[in-house]
């Protein structure tokens, strides 16, 4: 059993107030997330999580979809209060009746408490039943005027144990066009216009991470010119992607085989961006040619 205290966030609130967006936001922040958790299973789940020691941050949606919600939630919260291994908070999402009705009309879904089909009646009953839980919540967020992106920013600011910049990650990868463009790439750049080290016998079996290849690739004026333009393009747009709520931006740089030119450029870009951002560097096809030769 781990001695580390489990950080638990119970996401609840009005139906239609944004709990789906919220739980996705917690997943982006590195939380283990569970949607529609029956209250009776919460203690057992937390016990297993503590025993495994693998999960230190958990966010779970507990709401009206569980029929025993109101009967069980108070006793569950009482048990959490006296558990020294659990540090829990309640995030209560709310919105005005007008906004909730509008959202239900837009999605054409029925309210879980609207027995006769009238959405407003269901909202009124739910608001009355949830009032005690709302009063116990440490975090109450009114989402009436928030876009999904804005709600994600609110949650990130409140519940991330890192600064907002480090919760946004940049994946810089090299690849070979002959093996296909990466499906998850957001930005793709082509460096096949540069001289190819493959045609230098002494460089053919090396990669862009080797000093000899890197220096060769970067020795040309067009390499420096292109890189300067590349960096000048990417740096100003990163805050925009971050502000839009994107958690990972994948920048892919390709050459013919992904072994020499693209690898050198991806490495250089990664090193320069690491001064200000969280960056992960990878080289998808760096060893593809060597593997192919060995199999033949």
Curated annotation (Swiss-Prot):
The GO terms this record gives for MF are: ATP binding; GTP binding
UniProt binding sites for ATP: 13-20
Annotated residues that bind GTP are located at 63-66
Alphabetized, the UniProt keywords read: ATP-binding, GTP-binding, Nucleotide-binding
Which residue positions does the secretion signal occupy?
none
Do you know which Pfam families this protein is assigned to?
PapZ_C, RapZ-like_N
Function noted in UniProt: Displays ATPase and GTPase activities.
Decide whether keyword Nucleotide-binding is in the record: yes
Stored PANTHER family: RNASE ADAPTER PROTEIN RAPZ
Biological classification of the source: Bacteria, Bacillati, Bacillota, Bacilli, Lactobacillales
Q: Family per UniProt?
A: Belongs to the RapZ-like family.
Known HAMAP family for this protein?
RapZ_like (MF_00636)
Q: What is this protein called?
A: Nucleotide-binding protein SAG0531
Q: Which organism is it from?
A: Streptococcus agalactiae serotype V (strain ATCC BAA-611 / 2603 V/R)
């Amino acid at each position: 059993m781990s001695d580390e205290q489990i950080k638990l966030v119970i996401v609840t609130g009005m139906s239609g107030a944004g709990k789906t967006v919220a739980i996705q936001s917690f997943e982006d922040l590195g939380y283990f997330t569970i949607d529609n958790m029956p209250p009776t299973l919460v203690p057992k789940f937390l016990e297993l999580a503590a025993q495994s020691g693998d999960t230190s941050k958990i966010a779970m949606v507990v709401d009206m979809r569980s029929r025993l919600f109101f009967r069980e939630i108070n006793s569950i919260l009482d048990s959490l209060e006296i558990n020294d291994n659990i540090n829990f908070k309640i995030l209560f999402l709310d919105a005005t009746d007008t906004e909730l009705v509008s959202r239900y009309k837009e999605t054409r879904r029925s309210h879980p408490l609207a027995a006769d089909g009238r959405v407003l009646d269901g909202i009124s009953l739910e608001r009355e039943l949830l009032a005690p839980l709302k009063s116990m919540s440490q975090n109450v967020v009114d989402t009436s005027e928030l876009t999904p992106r804005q709600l994600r920013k609110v949650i990130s600011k409140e519940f991330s144990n890192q600064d907002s910049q480090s919760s946004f990650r940049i994946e810089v990868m090299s690849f070979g066009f002959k093996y296909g463009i990466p499906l998850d790439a957001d930005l793709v750049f082509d460096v096949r216009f540069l001289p190819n080290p493959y045609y230098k016998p002494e460089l053919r079996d090396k990669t862009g991470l080797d000093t000899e290849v890197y220096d060769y690739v970067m020795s040309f004026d067009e390499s420096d010119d292109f890189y300067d333009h590349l960096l000048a393009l990417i740096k100003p747009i990163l805050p925009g992607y971050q502000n839009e709520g994107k958690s990972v931006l994948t920048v892919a740089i390709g050459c013919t085989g992904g072994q020499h030119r693209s690898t050198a450029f991806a490495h250089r870009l990664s090193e320069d961006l690491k001064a200000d951002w969280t960056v992960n560097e990878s080289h998808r096809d760096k060893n593809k040619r060597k593997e192919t030769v060995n199999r033949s």
